[in-house]
UniProtKB/Swiss-Prot annotation:
Protein name (database record): Autophagy-related protein 9
Source organism (scientific name): Kluyveromyces marxianus (strain DMKU3-1042 / BCC 29191 / NBRC 104275)
Intramembrane stretches listed in the entry: 509-529, 698-718
Feature: compositional bias, Acidic residues: 63-78
Major subcellular site: membrane
Length: 906
């Protein structure tokens, strides 16, 4: 990176602490061990523009990372140009990524004052949190920040109807866009969603000052209002983090003297000196998932004890028991071999055991350091966020993010610097992007079908993704694409490095294949023993559970949305399993049922015969050997298990055949419906295709076992052929976002940007325009909506709906007055023209399942991201939300307005 030679007076070093608490002296700087994070001098707007335009002073694009490879440092490529706006990479002949900042345009007709808002405008990006390793944008941007009633970027008067029904009082500046702006392989062309994302009428807008504060929680946007005015979701009315007054004293504390600080001061010092925000936020989220300090420690100890037990019991049972004397012995001492570890274990096994003991020692040492790190995170939660460990199992993640946002604002206010106040900001979108920086790329990787996991073998041409193969893929690809700090290497953005990176990736695949060959015997043994101990008792006591199903690894990646955190996805996935079982059970398999009935009859007959004979001589007949070393008791257990398995697999109950309706309800949870499924929901082919995603657990265990053997061959022969596509994928799917660094372009929700080519009046009219022949409901059109736009909708809804502010294991509670309405209606039925919803107790699939599980309200257990929350679709005279629905809050309110308007015309 080239520094500006014209700048004689070098400004102070740009550290995270200086951004948060103001510029400090060199004496303090050296004492607090502040890390240098940028070699770029901070210029004003004129100097910055001159600096960028000067061809002799081009500088590399900076992100949160530094290159960790020697090949990047010695690269002869021309540096990538950086603009202070959002960066998009496009391939050009010379291999240099050219940047295209978003342009701003006025309304065509000028009927509404200001400009059409842009979801992530240049002003929004300029006011984002300053990323580590990057200089701030021009100071003029912060000086032009509006105040008072005009607070917020110009033109942010109209909000998206999706986010109108708010939880925390936040509104999105998201405006309408037409199909011209929603183009590309991942952008939908749904008419319904064109209307949903159309511009809202001017009469539905609110105070812009309030909107700026609200939107700052979800997306990076400056706020001039007091952050203390932000409301937190009930029942956790957390107090905003306090403004700390002793920060100047803490800045003079040396890193080696942290032991002299109190826990609160230590937590504040750690927060002020964060060097890698991605790692820090990941630790905060892991602490939230683990439910606190002691729960995480106990979980780590239990995992370590599980490994020890599996190795100990397998070694002991294999070398310390004399099985030849079992039949003639009556006590354990008679079959136990004394000093078996010295006399029975071979030297090779002893070496392996000592290696295992060394591994356990390293895990214990790692646990010691984990305890120290967890203690710091605990202090951060308790003293800075005001959240105790007792609240973590039930507190919503949205509340934690809100406290993080407020804490960042309080630190900026403490610095008393205009630039820091305006630009050092966090948001829910930033937090999710940083935590899921790698996961978002993995989601896009599988969604684009980049990887070829087949083998040139007739029986394995469609090899499925397994956990062991997934672990190897992450190790080879993500471990190569991201440096040790967790950021994408800039070499992946240069087309000239494509061939070199592809060859290096092939070498990693081949090396990983050899390592899997070496470790496969141990992995197979451990896998068999672990699952045997885990599932044997379950299958023995309840043999019918052998027919239980679970989602495959590839299904989990395809179902997961961009920026959807793990606990949100897990809740949605588990809630969908009940509906998935109901859907599959509606397709009777007559042929299999006939065969299983015969096997059940035969096995039951043998059990009956042996049981009757046992009555005559119970003492001796149970030990009677029917075959060599196989007694009556053995065969009774065997045939009894076979009978139970067949009985559980045969569905003898009468079920209502409504696969199409059930699958639509299932799709509302999985958010997955290929276009090939349209119009075929009731067919056996779609059911079989879904069963590949929701397979039998016993089948998945067998596939995992076989995968340990086949993984080396996939790494040798299949994945190296995709190396070029993988490198191209990272270059084409990576964007640079100021304040975040290099991220997956689909995770930035660029498809939600407004179309400035249409004025507000035209977009508002398109939202309410619908032909009488448009019989498809919004639920039906969800099928054709692209994943990125769908991820945006559910992300906004997850963080804005009050009913979604729940703990990790909590469901939506029943609402007063919501009983007695059918919940199995499609959107078309619910909003049918000229019809009213009947007050009756419907018995659709959802309601029947909830009644079976003891739930009076069918909405309980329906996560559905509440974007299509069914409880909000019904006009309830007994609830207090009637007025808000009439005002048109949210997507449902807009649809209600449209149909009400249509009925009035009639």
């Amino acid at each position: 990176m080239v520094d500006n030679q014209d700048n004689v007076n070098e400004p102070p070093k740009n550290t995270f602490l200086s951004r948060v608490f103001g510029v400090h002296s060199s004496a303090v700087e050296n004492s607090i061990d502040g890390a240098e994070m940028s070699h770029i001098s901070i210029h004003n707007s004129q100097e910055f523009n001159h600096f960028v335009e000067n061809e002799h002073h081009e500088r590399l694009i900076e992100s949160d990372q530094e290159s960790s490879t020697n090949e990047e440092e010695s690269n002869d490529e021309e540096p990538l140009i950086k603009q202070p706006q959002s960066i998009r990479f496009q391939e050009v002949p010379n291999g240099i990524a050219i940047t295209h900042p978003f342009s701003e345009s006025e309304d065509d007709e000028g009927e509404i004052e200001g400009r059409d808002p842009e979801f992530f405008s240049d002003q929004d990006l300029g006011s984002s949190i300053s990323k580590h390793g990057q200089g701030s944008s021009s100071e003029d941007e912060s000086e032009q920040a509006p105040t008072g009633d005009d607070a917020g970027p110009i033109g942010f008067e109209r909000n998206s109807p999706i986010v109108e029904n708010t939880r925390l009082g936040f509104h999105s500046p998201y405006d309408a866009n037409s199909k011209a702006n929603l183009k590309g392989p991942y952008l939908g062309h749904s008419k319904v969603f064109d209307r949903i994302f159309a511009n809202k009428p001017a009469g539905m807008s609110r105070n812009r000052r309030h909107d700026d504060l609200e939107e700052s929680f979800l997306f990076r946007k400056p706020s001039v209002a007091d952050p203390r005015s932000t409301k937190t979701p009930a029942p956790f009315n957390l107090k905003p983090p306090p403004i700390f007054q002793n920060v100047p004293n803490l800045t003079s504390v040396n890193k080696n003297s942290l032991s002299t600080l109190s826990p609160k001061e230590r937590a504040l010092w750690k927060w002020a000196n964060v060097e890698n925000l991605d790692t820090f936020l990941q630790q905060v989220y892991d602490y939230f998932l683990g439910n606190g300090f002691y729960c995480i420690i106990v979980d780590k100890v239990v995992q370590l004890a599980t490994i020890l037990f599996v190795v100990f019991i397998s070694t002991y049972m294999g070398h310390c028991i004399d099985y030849s004397r079992l039949s003639s012995s009556h006590s354990f001492k008679e079959v136990h071999i004394e000093q078996c570890y010295k006399t029975q274990i071979s030297p090779t096994a002893k070496v392996l055991l000592w290696i295992f003991y060394a591994f356990i020692g390293l895990k214990i040492l790692q646990l010691y350091f984990d305890v120290k790190a967890l203690k710091d995170v605990q202090n951060f939660y308790n003293y800075l966020l005001g959240i105790s460990d007792k609240d973590l199992p039930t507190i919503p993640w949205q509340s934690v993010v809100q406290q993080l946002v407020l804490l960042k604002d309080q630190n900026a206010i403490t610095a008393n610097a205009t630039e820091v106040k305006a630009k050092n900001r966090l948001s829910a979108h930033d937090v999710a992007n940083r935590i899921m920086r790698k996961e978002n790329f993995v989601i896009a990787l599988y969604d684009n079908n980049i990887l070829d996991l087949s083998l040139p073998i007739p029986l394995f041409r469609t090899c499925a993704l397994t956990k062991s193969l997934e672990w190897n893929i992450n190790l080879c690809i993500l471990g190569f694409a991201f440096n040790e700090r967790g950021y994408l290497k800039q070499a992946f953005l240069r087309e000239s490095q494509r061939e070199y990176l592809s060859e290096e990736l092939k070498k990693r695949f081949v090396l990983a294949g050899f390592l899997n060959i070496i470790l496969s015997p141990f992995l197979v043994t451990y896998f068999i023993l672990l699952n045997f101990f885990r599932y044997f008792n379950e299958y023995k006591t309840t043999p019918g559970s052998i027919g239980s199903r679970q989602y495959t690894p590839i299904a989990e990646w395809r179902f997961r949305e961009y920026n959807e955190l793990y606990h949100i996805f897990e809740k949605r996935k588990k809630l969908s399993m009940v509906i998935a079982d109901d859907y599959i059970s509606q397709f009777p398999n007559t042929l299999m049922s006939s065969l299983l009935s015969f096997v059940q009859f035969v096995s039951g007959s043998f059990v009956a015969i042996l049981g009757i004979l046992t009555v005559f001589d119970p003492d001796n007949f149970l030990n009677f050997e029917i075959t060599s070393d196989r007694t009556v008791l053995f065969y009774m257990t065997l045939f009894g298990s076979i009978w139970a398995i067949c009985h559980g697999a045969i569905n003898e109950e009468y079920t209502a055949f409504s696969p199409e309706e059930t699958l639509r309800e299932l799709i509302s949870f999985t958010h997955y419906s290929p276009k090939s499924w349209e119009g075929k929901y009731h067919t056996e082919d779609i059911k079989e295709e879904f069963c590949k995603l929701y397979n039998l657990r016993i089948i998945l265990l067998l596939k995992e076992l076989v995968s340990i053997i086949l993984t080396p061959f996939i790494l040798w022969f299949s994945l190296p052929k995709n190396s070029d596509r993988i490198i191209d994928f990272f270059r084409e799917c990576t964007v640079y976002e100021e304040g975040l660094g290099y991220v997956c372009k689909y995770a930035m929700f660029d498809g939600a940007k407004v179309n400035k080519g249409l004025n507000a009046k035209t977009q508002a009219s398109k939202m309410f325009s619908q032909t009488d022949n448009d019989d498809e409901s919004d639920s039906d059109n969800d099928i054709g909506v692209n994943k990125m736009l769908q991820s945006y909708m559910y992300f906004v809804d997850d963080y804005k709906k009050a009913e979604n502010a729940l703990g990790k294991n909590q469901l939506i509670s029943p609402k007063e007055g919501s009983f007695g309405y059918p919940r199995d209606y499609s959107w078309k039925t619910q909003f049918a023209l000229g019809k009213k919803i009947n007050k009756r107790s419907g018995e659709g699939p959802s309601q029947r399942r909830n009644l079976e599980h003891g739930s009076a309200n069918p909405d309980v257990g329906s996560l559905n991201a509440s974007f299509i929350n069914k409880s909000s679709l019904y006009k309830d005279d007994f609830t207090e939300n009637t007025d808000e629905m009439k005002k048109g809050n949210g997507v449902m309110g807009l649809l209600n307005q449209y149909y009400k308007k249509y009925d009035n015309k009639r």
